[in-house]
Amino acid sequence: MKSMRILPISLTIMAGLLSIEASAVEFHGYARSGIGWTGSGGEQQCFQSTGAQSKYRLGNECETYAELKLGQELWKDGNKSFYFDTNVAYSVAQKNDWESTDPAFREVNVQAKNVIDWLPGSTLWAGKRFYQRHDVHMIDFYYWDISGPGAGLQDIDLGFSKLALAVTRNTESGGSYGWIASQRKEIPTSNDVYDIRLSGLEVNPGGNLELGFDYGRANARDHYKLDRHASKDGFMFTAEHTQSMLGGFNKFVVQYATDSMTSSNSGHSEGASVNNDGYMLRILNHGAINLAEKWDLMYVAMYQDTDRDNNNGNTWYTVGVRPMYKWTSTMSTLLDIGYDNVKSQRTHDTNDQYKITLAQQWQAGDSIWSRPAIRLFATYAKWNEKWGNANKKDGYIDGMAYRDTATHKFSRGDDDEFTFGAQFEAWW
C-alpha cells in the first residue's frame, strides 16, 4: 500500500517538472500502421520489382513504422541559438499486439545558428543527423541522402547562393583485413563522405538550382588493409532544378556517380566492396501540383543506369502518377498507378511490374500532402520476371544476377496478386 501512495505523488512531481519545460520542447515525427489481407489468403503482401530500389508505396506498405523526434532550443541570445535534436525510429511487421524491436537511434545532434560572427545566417552542427535529404515521396525513394554521424557548416551566404559543407560517415559490415596472432581477421570498414552544396541559385522566374558534389572513401584502421580489388573511393555529382508551378513544384534531377558511390546510388560510400567499380547515371523528374480546384497530382518518371565493371549492373525505368480527387476538405479518393522495368546488365533479361491502388481517404486538410490520413485501399499488382540475384544458399555467386532456368528460379516469375486493407499515415 505504501508504494501505491508514493506512485501518485511521483506522477504529480513528474507532471509538474514536465509542465515547466513543455512549452520549449518540440515534438515532431512520422508514423504509419494498418492491417491488410491478400486475395489468395494470408496477411497483406507487398510488391517490389526485383532490381528496383523502391516501390510505389500507396496501399503497398506492410510494416508499422515510426520516427519520434524530440528537440529543444537550449540557449538563445538575440539571433544566436543552440538547438538539440533527436530522432528514434521503430519498425515492426505489424503481425501481433506485442512486437518487440530494437529502436534505431537515427538522429542526435546540436545545431548552432549565427555563432560565427563573420558568417551571419550560417548554422554550425555536429552529431547524427538527417542531412538535407532529397526524396520522391510516392515511391519512398531517397536519391540524395548522406545522413549519418557527421559535422558541417550550412547556409553560408555567398550573395548569389547558399554554400553548405559537411562530412558524414557510414560503415560497411566487413572489407578490412588484418593478421592478428597469425590469423586472418576481417572487421567493419568506415567510409567518409565529404559533401559540398550550392543552393538557391536563381536561374529563371520561380526556378532555382542546387548543385552538389560528394566524395566518398573507405578508411581502414591501422594494421588493416582493403582488398586489392576494392573500389576504395568514388564521387557523386548532383544537379537539381526546382520550379514552382501550379500551386506546387516540379523537380528535375541529373546525377552521376562512380565506383564506391554506386552501391546505394544515394550518397553513401562502400569503398571496401570489390564488386561496385563502375558508374551510375540517373535522370529524374518528379513533383506535386494542383490541377484544378478539386484535383491534385503527384508524379514521377526516372531513368537509372548502373553499369558495373563486373557486368552485374542494371537499368531501371519507373513511371507513375497519383491523382487525388477532393470530395470535401477532409475526404478524397486517390488512384496510384506505377510501372517498373529493370533490365539486367549480365543476363540482358527484363523484370517488369505494374501496380494499381485505389484508396478512399480521410485527411486533415484538402492538400495531397495533408496528414494525418486514414485510408481504405485495394491494390492489384502484376509482374513478369526472368532474372534475380543469387544468395549464398543457392550455391551460386552471392549477389550475382542469374537468368531463371527450368531447375532454379531466381526471380518472382510471372504472377499477379490482389490486396486490400486500411492504413493511417501521419507526420507532424
UniProtKB/Swiss-Prot annotation:
The gene is lamB. One of its GO terms (cellular component) is pore complex. Coiled coil: none annotated. Keywords: Cell outer membrane, Ion transport, Membrane, Porin, Signal, Sugar transport, Transmembrane, Transmembrane beta strand, Transport. GO terms for molecular function: maltodextrin transmembrane transporter activity; maltose transporting porin activity. Belongs to the porin LamB (TC 1.B.3) family. It is a multi-pass membrane protein. CDD domains: Maltoporin-like. The record marks Y142 as: Important in sugar transport. GO terms for biological process: monoatomic ion transport. Induction: By maltose. The record marks Y30, Y65, W98, F249, W369, W427 as: Greasy slide, important in sugar transport. HAMAP family: LamB. InterPro entries: G_neg_Bact_CarbUptk_Porin, Maltoporin, Porin_LamB, Porin_LamB_sf. NCBIfam families: PRK09360.1. Homotrimer formed of three 18-stranded antiparallel beta-barrels, containing three independent channels. It catalyses: beta-maltose(in) = beta-maltose(out). This is Maltoporin. Residues 1-24 form the signal peptide.
